[in-house]
Amino acid sequence: MEDRIPVADLQHSAGSLAAIAFHNIEHCTQKTSSAILGYYHLPHIGSEHSSSDNADEAAKYTKAFIKGRKVAVKVANLINQGKTIHPVPLRVTGSGLVGGPPCEGHARLIEGITWFEKTQFHHQSLRPEGNHSTASHYLHFSTPLAQIIPGAEGRTQPMDVVQDITLISGMCLWASRIIQSSMPRGQRLDVSRLLSSKITLYEVEYLARAVPVIADLAAALSANNPYGPTPLNIRLDIPSFHYYHSLEERLRDGCCTFPEALQWMHAVEKRHHQLSRVFCRLIDHELSRRWVGTPHRRKLDVQVSPLADLVFQLICDSLANSVLPDVDDILQIVQTEDTTWVRFYSLVPENEKVTDFRALSYLFYVYQVLRPALEQTHVNTTEGDEATSKLLISVDDAFERRIYSRSQKLLKKLRASLPASAAVPHLLEVYLCRRIFINSNETGSNLYLDDPSPEPFVLRLCQGLAPEGKQELVRAQDRHNTRPETIKLDAFDVVEGLYGSHIAEVLKDLFAEVGLGA
């Protein structure tokens, strides 16, 4: 049976209402006439990898496919414990999308050309849609090593060497446009822009896209060993103090007072807590759907941005005293409060040490990836014990790739410094394929940068959607009492068209619990 996985093309330009066109992802990315520039669907392994007449460009697509496909197969072998009899927890199909930003420039430099393998997760039951036992996603798997976990592949039970597993993800707050509008250059702060109770399309869509993948991975990792499972943790990184460096520029320019700056930071803190709660609650909800009927439900350790709250509070304390925060003072306090930060910071080369708040913000994203690897755990002390590993699995958008590339470099240094008895950490990167493209992916932009929220969206086209998808959009039309030719959609309507009514309704309820809505 064909999977009908929709994507949306968000057409938006200054001064006009944003228009949404829905397409079937496999139909609209045919190599001869792709509606999403730079992306092509490959229905099977032997397909051509690019329709480009440029030999260099075609070579990039071919290389991306070969490299991505190899890692995808290794991931399936690892998670399925070498089993091949269907149904297995994770199946890589050999079909997928290859692509990225359509032309050279900053976006392609960050993301490159990527192979997104059509990946299917099999579950005993997915409540409330109990008859849907397979979830499909387009995912890119990446590791700098020849093996995901050296020494594990080729074993009868490859996951036996894994001491614990940590799934790592995160998201931004609001969207870039809203944050920038709250601090217009050369003008006073406008904190009201951050105090709106409206959610952005970026926030809702990212959660609808990322959380099911996190839950599917958690369930797949548990499927082969339900009675004696490897410890499984989830770490979410949601920014708080990380936005301060932009505010600091306004303070130094005299565009805001210390009380105004403090109010702005408190608005960020409020959104941080709201998004953290929704993220955690949605993970819990999606896991409960996948683990229904299993011998026992696992209790996961879920943490959000450890240590970041201390930095946030130190910054706010300085602002409350009308003093510009000093990054060196804050670093000194953090060094005395957290041993994992001390171990992490010792891995950072001298020429990459923190000199300002912008650098601290970026380095903290890297720290959150490495933190599970730095935390003290049991090590093998008996002679002859086999070496064990910690498996870190990140789930994120490809435009955050530089965070994980930096993390891999520091992990390599960490592994070299560990005693022979220590659990060795390895990071598997999982990247989500976009489901909303901006202006047909003309410049390779992403939803966070170009989200027109809180403006509504006009439905322009819904070709290629499954009948139930079209029914969902008709229901949206009825809710908003709009004429067929001018159907206006809010963020939840767009998510409903992309991911279905169930997750859209759950998200609507969870956001309402924290005082946010469309």
From Swiss-Prot:
Its EC number is 6.3.2.-. Coiled coil: none annotated. Disulfide bonds: none annotated. This is Arginine-containing cyclodipeptide synthase ankA. It comes from the Eukaryota. It comes from Aspergillus thermomutatus. The keyword Ligase applies. Pathway: Secondary metabolite biosynthesis. One of its GO terms (molecular function) is ligase activity. Arginine-containing cyclodipeptide synthase; part of the ank cluster that mediates the biosynthesis of NK13650 C, a highly modified cyclo-arginine-tyrosine dipeptide connected to homoserine, citrate and aspartate. Within the pathway, ankA acts as the scaffold-generating enzyme and is responsible for formation of the cyclo-Arg-Tyr diketopiperazine (cRY) from L-arginyl-tRNA(Arg) and L-tyrosyl-tRNA(Tyr). The ankA product cRY is desaturated by the cytochrome P450 monooxygenase ankB to yield a dehydro-cyclodipeptide intermediate. Transmembrane segments: none annotated. Belongs to the arginine-containing cyclodipeptide synthase family. It catalyses: L-tyrosyl-tRNA(Tyr) + L-arginyl-tRNA(Arg) = cyclo(L-arginyl-L-tyrosyl) + tRNA(Tyr) + tRNA(Arg) + H(+). The conserved DDXXE motif is essential for catalytic activity.
